[in-house]
Amino acid sequence: MDLSAVQIQEVQNVLHAMQKILECPICLELIKEPVSTKCDHIFCKFCMLKLLNQKKGPSQCPLCKNEITKRSLQGSTRFSQLAEELLRIMAAFELDTGMQLTNGFSFSKKRNNSCERLNEEASIIQSVGYRNRVRRLPQVEPGNATLKDSLGVQLSNLGIVRSVKKNRQTQPRKKSVYIELDSDSSEETVTKPGDCSVRDQELLQTAPQEAGDEGKLHSAEEAACEFSEGIRNIEHHQCSDDLNPTENHATERHPEKCQSISISNVCVEPCGTDAHASSLQPETSSLLLIEDRMNAEKAEFCNKSKQPGIAVSQQSRWAASKGTCNDRQVPSTGEKVGPNADSLSDREKWTHPQSLCPENSGATTDVPWITLNSSVQKVNEWFSRTGEMLTSDSASARRHESNAEAAVVLEVSNEVDGGFSSSRKTDLVTPDPHHTLMCKSGRDFSKPVEDNISDKIFGKSYQRKGSRPHLNHVTEIIGTFITEPQITQEQPFTNKLKRKRSTSLQPEDFIKKADSAGVQRTPDNINQGTDLMEPNEQAVSTTSNCQENKIAGSNLQKEKSAHPTESLRKEPASTAGAKSISNSVSDLEVELNVHSSKAPKKNRLRRKSSIRCALPLEPISRNPSPPTCAELQIDSCGSSEETKKNHSNQQPAGHLREPQLIEDTEPAADAKKNEPNEHIRKRRASDAFPEEKLMNKAGLLTSCSSPRKSQGPVNPSPQRTGTEQLETRQMSDSAKELGDRVLGGEPSGKTTDRSEESTSVSLVSDTDYDTQNSVSVLDAHTVRYARTGSAQCMTQFVASENPKELVHGSNNAGSGTEGLKPPLRHALNLSQEKVEMEDSELDTQYLQNTFQVSKRQSFALFSKPRSPQKDCAHSVPSKELSPKVTAKGKQKERQGQEEFEISHVQAVAATVGLPVPCQEGKLAADTMCDRGCRLCPSSHYRSGENGLSATGKSGISQNSHFKQSVSPIRSSIKTDNRKPLTEGRFERHTSSTEMAVGNENILQSTVHTVSLNNRGNACQEAGSGSIHEVCSTGDSFPGQLGRNRGPKVNTVPPLDSMQPGVCQQSVPVSDKYLEIKKQEGEAVCADFSPCLFSDHLEQSMSGKVFQVCSETPDDLLDDVEIQGHTSFGEGDIMERSAVFNGSILRRESSRSPSPVTHASKSQSLHRASRKLESSEESDSTEDEDLPCFQHLLSRISNTPELTRCSSAVTQRMPEKAEGTQAPWKGSSSDCNNEVIMIEASQEHQFSEDPRCSGSMFSSQHSAAQGSTANANSQDSNFIPPSKQRSHQCGNEEAFLSDKELISDNEEMATCLEEDNDQEEDSIIPDSEASGYESETNLSEDCSQSDILTTQQRATMKYNLIKLQQEMAHLEAVLEQRGNQPSGHSPSLLADPCALEDLPDLEPNMSGAAILTSKNINENPVSQNLKSACDDKFQLQHLEGPTSGDDESGMGRPSPFKSPLAGSRGSAHGCSRHLQKRNSPSQEELLQPAGSEASSEPHNSTGQSCLPRRELEGTPYLGSGISLFSSRDPESESPKEPAHIGTTPASTSALKIPQGQVAFRSAAAAGADKAVVGIVSKIKPELTSSEERADRDISMVVSGLTPKEVMTVQKFAEKYRLTLTDAITEETTHVIIKTDAEFVCERTLKYFLGIAGGKWIVSYSWVVRSIQERRLLNVHEFEVKGDVVTGRNHQGPRRSRESREKLFKGLQVYCCEPFTNMPKDELERMLQLCGASVVKELPSLTHDTGAHLVVIVQPSAWTEDSNCPDIGQLCKARLVMWDWVLDSLSSYRCRDLDAYLVQNITCDSSEPQDSND
């Protein structure tokens, strides 16, 4: 008791010290929501806010008195994680010790039951697994007795009891306190010890005293995490000393050694300690040698193993495990017990110098003593943590001597100890992976005989491999799922990963640190060395450098031991043990361990197979065998876990991540896959030892992270393999932890988040670009996604290097991983990435490898956007399976990458090879399929390269989801699950689409089908879409249609992320809309930046050559405009696409203003390149697409002019349908539309025209593509509008010039719109990425027309100014006509010719238009178009008839919403017009917007022409898809409506005759006007219905960051809400930042909102609505209180519901100065609350009968003497302004007496961010 009490007290002291460190200096409580000041002091957020609010002057830091401001405060997630972990550790401590931290050392009865053992194990306190601990504590009591009995029997039989006693005496000095802090790990460890509980308990009995002594010796060190290292050092030295003497007394001192080693290693499991002691004894000599190198590590492990917490929790574990072990032993109790005795005997023998000698000699041959010792120690530490590693180590050491005996022993000990850690450790100790595998198998399924035989057989092969110890270790690690030593070897990487995770400070990580602090820390150090050394060591192992290999192995073992414990802690009781094993197994072993944890016996069987595999794998790993790869692939298909494990066996370092992914995925199918995995492993062991092949396969299987690792390891070079192994192990460990958590039952969301955090770090190393980007931990989600993508990309690169291997791996991954658990796998990927990031050195090496594969690194500029690209890259590697593809991929990688920079192919930096290989080498096989079906590429990958395809989808899905929702990881996980199905559908749809290229109608039908399917799997498709996009970018050089499909798929992911419905439609559209339909689909996605993807795809396809050149130039030229777009694009998954579209539109607009034809031509080139970048422009051969569109046009209209107009209209219509994405593009595209229409008339118009050519053109385009009938009706409407416009403008030429001006202005507006859209998109997904993307888009576009773009931009700016002036005038006219719904009718009717022309177009377009309209109707984009701000839309609509921009005006009712919204407004206007045409409801909505008077006549015409189709589309559009469309931007620039009118004409001209400027000027102008008129007509209806409803919500934001503001802007656009900068009477909602409890900070808008009875809504409403893709109920998100007045005063609700004014009957004078609020705002608040405000002090009189109040802010006064004078003069109450603010906050009049200046010292609280 004394020992245990002392050690517990030490731990308690440590916890108290940590608690003291983590307490807030202000409230003296544990920090909550910590914020750091500039002086680096940490305080509670609310404490600081309260402090800042209460101080009159500048606030000072309470500690250093430095000045602090609210703006200088920065959130400290690290400290919050620390505090959270501390709370968890404390809870675990209380659970383990049964005493309150504050209640001294009172043990619970449960603890007392295990008191003796605790005394013995006093050195071990496990704070891990506090959840399962509750369950285990009860188990410990009975379990202890049982364990005692069984241990007594077994130990006595083995002579261990005696040795245990001696050890107790000997070891006390070495005892250290090992605190396992990992919550889940502890549980898992406890569970595992159940397996090893017999031995562990005995050993614990022996070790507790020794451990306790050591703990006492090093109690000071134990107090801190670092102390454990020191203790470990001492302990290790002592252990080594003890072990050396113990060697002399094998049996007696074996326990001692076990204990010292176990203590040093982790002293968690007595059984493990026993076995480990034996194994450690043989290793002791080596340990002594290793100690020098790994002293710190060992000390760490020892300390942690010694920590009393571990002993306590271990006892619980052992008790619990004992039962488990007994159960497990039941099947072969005799065998197991016998083997156990044998194993113990063997261990003792092993401990004997002879045993040590044989074992060591074997180990020495395989692994040098130093390496062996360090490995054993690490394994032992891991065992102590897991509760079974110790036993396993000894068992494995013994196995080296006698494989058969060892196998039985391992089986028994593994069964008893949990077998997971034991076996691994034994394997690590024993250079015989075969033996270990057999032992594990026997232990798992109590097949001792089999195991023994296998161990004997494989043991020999393993011994043979012993000559190359490191490779053997690697092989073992690869077979780690089966072979524990392998796990141990990989553990160093795992530890590293854990360390990184620790840096992330995830709660579990923190706990893990405590639990496996010693193991992990030292291993981390070692790992870093090992990681650096491992590649070399691996090479050495290849060269038979046993010593180095052994060292690496020991390092790995230590790391693994740490990692498995982490896993165990993470997983619940039974799963905990298994999971800890999986963690210790590192990446590959992790999978097996996870399986064993979930299904211990099954998992063990897996391990057996794994072990078998590992045994042969180790020797074979040197000899890569392609046949084995194929076999492995098949096996992995059978069980991805097995495949992954095999891969990891073959590729220890390179495939660690892959095992993680597979492991995580496997747990779900644990039972199912256990045997198959075993089988596969065996096969692999025998046939698939080639590391390269297995690595490649494993990498592909890993899908995201594994492939990455594969890349390096895929190459046979040992160094590279070693490096990647390290990386892989680290990554896999993180992934495993994540997967373990998920599997263990931890909240998937939580796990995902944690893993994401880690991943963000680890991914950096994996990706070329993400390496740089992922380094930042700030954007954890974004970085994670990006990293995931990068990992995928890297994997693909590896695949390119080893195409053969890649192919196999891809197939395996596709069938196994895809089916298994995409979400889990994704989480693992994140974790792995995190780990990888941590391996800076490994990361560097890996990056170098990756860069070797992908020579083009320009995507580094777009690190964040790369995450999607990386996802794409993942799919690319599948294509790169063939060597020629790899070579071509590298060549085209640069071009494709540049093109993809914007289209997220940048993430494919490594993947860029994919587009290229797809185009050239893979084009033949994969690319052709891709081109055949844009969606097919993903499906193609799936079928041909299943693994990569699934991986790519996962990554993409992640990206899209990340952008889609605040919790992208969860979404991405879900997306991954869906993607396989969706992709399957997509494949079919794409195939049908490809076949239907000739038949547009068929394509449209397919699109419909795909649309429906895609809606179901919108997210999935979104993810796959980006992948497809990448592939299609490279693949569809020849096939523009294919490109279109690719872009559509690309478009789909953004839409999907933003809106499931849109995404779904978008995806099908991409497949079906070869020309027009593709455009439509892109338009649907355009709002979400699907356009960006489409454009990127097109660009990469058609403009690859100039893309590289144009990336930078375009960026420079369109930098300003496109930056906005970039934000939008980045926001979306397909950010680049959207960005590029915006850029293209802008450039085109700038070109088109004066030289329309010339601009159109140059723009067509730009568009082609942009199309490569954006999926919309993926018709990169716009000529091909154009012909298709021309065919449609020819069908649509008889007259060329009308045809052009209809084309414009048709294109505009689909664009509108496509979404607001098109709108912002459209504004830029006004002039560019001509070029784009000609070159990429279908695709680009689809994506860009909707935005480019105002609402008119978008509607035209939509009509043509969406529905020929719609287009015809539009055309007929077009003509009247054009006449109206000509009437309004005076003449068509004037109107055209006006249009040009408008188009220029619209380009500018589009820039704004694009900026806003991108910003919003990027806010949701990743704004940073969007920035880069926009640059890329610009640069790509600029490649062909940099000068032209620059000139056009200048012209656009000039025209924009002009347009703004004109629009001001137009707005005035519109306002005048605002009340006249028939304002436009005269002009429409006035153009009978135009009307006639429209009918001509109508019949021609009816067929195609109908199909298009249906598709468009399905597309939510139409709704988006109509969702432009009503007010501006109305104004612009009125304006439009005059300026030809009515529709645009209608589409732009959101100028109030924001400049961004305004910018998109013009494009959105077009989209809305299209939508309106498609659906009268949209028209109605638009009508109220502001063009009711002017556009109602048009509405009538448009409705009549397009009534039914529009009606069909309206419901869909009204469904909220319009949220994704950028309608708000349209409203921003009233000039854009005119531009819209012009754009349709120019678009038609571009599409049909690029050089027909004259026609475009006249007929096009007329057509444009007509279109505008039609759109106006349609728009009013839409506006009246839907937009009126949307108009009900007018929002302002307060206290939000720029990113959050952009998110709100996107949110407003998507749901057609109004977003303004200031609170007005029309404002209904104030969006404010709050905490989880909806408590906000007080801002000026907060006060004004309450005063005005507005909804004060948390920003969470926006986030959640975006995540759930629907407008949630605001009531659930209403602010409840503020940090000053109270956290739940319900003031906002009270103000809304109150019908009486708060300050009614008061006459108030506000006496300046006021520091944080303007006087007029304060007066405004008072007036809103019913007070009578006087401007002059003398005006305060009692005649009115009102109460007189003078509001002052004493803290702002320089002279106090003024206050009494004023009070006396006015005879009014002198009240502090806090009374107004506090009363207003709670909307209750506070007692004036408490705020009277006469009664208070002037200390007022000032509102925060009053200007916000």
From Swiss-Prot:
<keyword id="KW-0234">DNA repair</keyword>
<dbReference type="GO" id="GO:0035825">
    <property type="term" value="P:homologous recombination"/>
</dbReference>
<dbReference type="GO" id="GO:0000976">
    <property type="term" value="F:transcription cis-regulatory region binding"/>
</dbReference>
<feature type="region of interest" description="Disordered">
    <location>
        <begin position="321"/>
        <end position="362"/>
    </location>
</feature>
<keyword id="KW-0677">Repeat</keyword>
<feature type="compositionally biased region" description="Basic and acidic residues">
    <location>
        <begin position="1527"/>
        <end position="1538"/>
    </location>
</feature>
<feature type="modified residue" description="Phosphoserine">
    <location>
        <position position="1495"/>
    </location>
</feature>
<feature type="compositionally biased region" description="Polar residues">
    <location>
        <begin position="321"/>
        <end position="332"/>
    </location>
</feature>
<dbReference type="GO" id="GO:0031436">
    <property type="term" value="C:BRCA1-BARD1 complex"/>
</dbReference>
<feature type="modified residue" description="Phosphoserine">
    <location>
        <position position="831"/>
    </location>
</feature>
<dbReference type="GO" id="GO:0042802">
    <property type="term" value="F:identical protein binding"/>
</dbReference>
<dbReference type="GO" id="GO:0016604">
    <property type="term" value="C:nuclear body"/>
</dbReference>
<feature type="modified residue" description="Phosphothreonine">
    <location>
        <position position="1350"/>
    </location>
</feature>
<dbReference type="GO" id="GO:0044818">
    <property type="term" value="P:mitotic G2/M transition checkpoint"/>
</dbReference>
<dbReference type="GO" id="GO:0051298">
    <property type="term" value="P:centrosome duplication"/>
</dbReference>
<keyword id="KW-0158">Chromosome</keyword>
<keyword id="KW-0808">Transferase</keyword>
<feature type="cross-link" description="Glycyl lysine isopeptide (Lys-Gly) (interchain with G-Cter in SUMO2)">
    <location>
        <position position="109"/>
    </location>
</feature>
<keyword id="KW-0539">Nucleus</keyword>
<feature type="compositionally biased region" description="Polar residues">
    <location>
        <begin position="538"/>
        <end position="556"/>
    </location>
</feature>
<keyword id="KW-0007">Acetylation</keyword>
<dbReference type="GO" id="GO:0071356">
    <property type="term" value="P:cellular response to tumor necrosis factor"/>
</dbReference>
<keyword id="KW-0963">Cytoplasm</keyword>
<feature type="region of interest" description="Disordered">
    <location>
        <begin position="1244"/>
        <end position="1289"/>
    </location>
</feature>
<feature type="modified residue" description="Phosphoserine">
    <location>
        <position position="1303"/>
    </location>
</feature>
<dbReference type="GO" id="GO:0006302">
    <property type="term" value="P:double-strand break repair"/>
</dbReference>
<feature type="cross-link" description="Glycyl lysine isopeptide (Lys-Gly) (interchain with G-Cter in SUMO2)">
    <location>
        <position position="336"/>
    </location>
</feature>
<dbReference type="GO" id="GO:0110025">
    <property type="term" value="P:DNA strand resection involved in replication fork processing"/>
</dbReference>
<feature type="region of interest" description="Disordered">
    <location>
        <begin position="1313"/>
        <end position="1343"/>
    </location>
</feature>
<feature type="modified residue" description="Phosphoserine">
    <location>
        <position position="706"/>
    </location>
</feature>
<feature type="compositionally biased region" description="Polar residues">
    <location>
        <begin position="352"/>
        <end position="362"/>
    </location>
</feature>
<dbReference type="GO" id="GO:0000724">
    <property type="term" value="P:double-strand break repair via homologous recombination"/>
</dbReference>
<dbReference type="GO" id="GO:0006282">
    <property type="term" value="P:regulation of DNA repair"/>
</dbReference>
<dbReference type="GO" id="GO:0070533">
    <property type="term" value="C:BRCA1-C complex"/>
</dbReference>
<keyword id="KW-0805">Transcription regulation</keyword>
<feature type="compositionally biased region" description="Polar residues">
    <location>
        <begin position="947"/>
        <end position="972"/>
    </location>
</feature>
<dbReference type="GO" id="GO:0007095">
    <property type="term" value="P:mitotic G2 DNA damage checkpoint signaling"/>
</dbReference>
<dbReference type="GO" id="GO:0008630">
    <property type="term" value="P:intrinsic apoptotic signaling pathway in response to DNA damage"/>
</dbReference>
<dbReference type="InterPro" id="IPR011364">
    <property type="entry name" value="BRCA1"/>
</dbReference>
<dbReference type="GO" id="GO:0005737">
    <property type="term" value="C:cytoplasm"/>
</dbReference>
<feature type="region of interest" description="Disordered">
    <location>
        <begin position="1030"/>
        <end position="1056"/>
    </location>
</feature>
<feature type="modified residue" description="Phosphoserine">
    <location>
        <position position="1180"/>
    </location>
</feature>
